[in-house]
């Protein structure tokens, strides 16, 4: 999960004297939403492709006020980067070191491929969303309820949280689902959503939807 294992460096960082027209060609060639800009070896920020299209004759240095300032450190983890993809509506994130020097990038496709290997996304089985008052929330208890009913607990995400309650979506095996439901309700949980079919098309759809929910959270 360490970022350095997923860094690519074939996408160049551009200087402030590069024209927006040239930068746009780079973005299009790689099918990325942003290009990255440096000045004297120091990372400055990222510019959206749409901004380049609207300012083709300008140099990137003139577009500094329109830059998004996002990046991730070389020593970070994949999960540190997930939120950035959603927040900045990007499919590429620059990786820098502590001196703000460009080290390469991570692309959303690479992250999605890696996350899809996690049991939460890769295992067949049931998806179950439960709600519990925030003061009573315990991931340990949630896993114990599943396993005490001879179910397998493949993973869980906190998909919603506020001052009143926490909602947790979990991937569990298909065994003893009725007794798992009943136990959750007996312990004060509200069953928000159940998805127990394992038809391939619906399963892939559910994985995508919950990955998007995770990013939004």
Positions of PLM-derived features:
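Short acidic/polar active-site loop segments enriched in Thr and Asp
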Residues: 33, 91, 152
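Cytosolic regulatory modules rich in charged/polar residues
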Residues: 70-71, 96-98, 102-217
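Exposed loop/turn and edge beta-strand positions of beta-sandwich/beta-sheet ligand-binding modules
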Residues: 31, 89, 166
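Bateman/CBS regulatory modules and CBS-like beta-alpha motifs in cytosolic regions of diverse proteins
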Residues: 1-26, 36-39, 43-48, 53-86, ...
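Generic preference for hydrophobic/aromatic residues in regular secondary structure cores
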Residues: 17, 31, 57-61, 110-112, ...
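Intrinsically disordered, low-complexity terminal regulatory regions
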Residues: 13, 18-29, 34, 203-211, ...
């Amino acid at each position: 999960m360490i970022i350095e294992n997923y860094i690519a460096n074939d996408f160049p960082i551009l200087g402030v004297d590069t024209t927006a027209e040239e930068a746009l060609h780079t973005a299009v060639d790689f099918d990325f939403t942003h290009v990255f800009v440096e000045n004297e070896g120091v990372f400055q920020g990222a510019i959206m492709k749409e901004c380049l299209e609207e300012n083709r004759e300008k140099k990137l240095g003139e577009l500094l006020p329109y830059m998004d300032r996002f990046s991730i450190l070389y020593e970070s983890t994949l999960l540190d980067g997930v939120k950035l993809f959603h927040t900045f509506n990007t499919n590429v994130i620059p990786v820098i070191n502590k001196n703000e020097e460009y080290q390469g990038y991570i692309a959303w496709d690479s992250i999605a491929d890696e996350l899809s290997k996690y049991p939460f996304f890769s295992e067949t089985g049931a998806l179950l969303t439960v709600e519990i008052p925030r003061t009573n929330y315990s991931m340990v208890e949630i896993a114990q309820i599943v396993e005490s009913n001879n179910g397998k607990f493949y993973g869980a995400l906190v998909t919603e949280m506020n001052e009143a309650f926490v909602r947790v979506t979990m991937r569990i095996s298909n065994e003893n689902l009725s007794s798992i439901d009943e136990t959750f309700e007996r312990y004060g949980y509200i069953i928000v959503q159940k998805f127990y079919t394992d038809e391939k098309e619906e399963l892939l759809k559910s994985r995508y939807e919950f990955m998007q929910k995770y990013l939004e959270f």
